[in-house]
Regions:
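Anionic-ligand binding patches
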Residues: 2-4, 10-29, 33-192
Length: 192
């Protein structure tokens, strides 16, 4: 089955396709002829943003679409950055700028209180029915400095206790088997 991926994020597309394998073929917005589509993520929840993206692309193409909205929720920050994860340090901020702001916000917070989770909501929108969502989470805590070279986003400061490593220190196949995105995609049931 083919699904139009409602994202221009190449890292996200590669990770999702690696997790899905041959089960589902993700078609990029460019390949679907709507690479110039712009979707404002203004929802208050991951679910609202994922649904908005999937439905917008489904309406533009007339084809089943899949979207992901994900982020980092840090308990000591009241769940922030949450839906603002990608722009925590401001619109257009780099991963390093976002990480720097996060580490500054947690300066002086003891390890036991640096608990966090990556959250991912996958939405699938079909032309003939209501969209469906699937949620996945990955628990961990925030380190005081970056570790590792793999992954993207906040992976270098997100520690996974089970492995004793940051997400960025894990090989891609291990990360993809435990990540929030993997947990959400594992729940995905496609209706043809």
């Amino acid at each position: 089955m083919k699904l139009i991926l409602a994202s221009q994020n190449k890292h996200k597309a590669q990770e999702m396709q690696a997790i899905l394998g041959d089960k589902i073929e993700l078609v990029t917005l460019d390949a679907a002829g709507c690479g110039d589509i712009e979707i404002i993520e203004d929802g208050d929840t991951f679910e609202a943003n994922a649904i908005k993206k999937a439905v917008t692309v489904m309406r533009a193409t007339g084809l089943p679409s899949i979207a992901d909205d994900s982020g980092l929720c840090v308990d000591a920050l009241g769940g922030a950055p949450g839906v603002y994860t990608a722009r925590f340090a401001g619109e257009g901020a780099s991963d390093d700028q976002n990480i720097s702001k996060l580490l500054n916000a947690l300066d002086g917070v003891e390890t036991a209180k640096r608990t966090a989770r990556f959250v991912c909501v996958i939405a699938v929108a079909y032309p003939d029915r209501e969209p469906v969502t699937f949620r996945g989470e990955c628990e961990g805590y925030i380190l005081t400095e970056k570790r590792g070279e793999n992954g993207f986003g906040y992976d270098p400061v997100f520690f996974v206790e089970k492995f004793g490593k940051s997400m960025a220190e894990l090989p891609a196949e291990v990360k993809n088997s435990i990540s929030h995105r993997s947990c959400a995609l594992a729940k995905l049931s496609i209706e043809e």
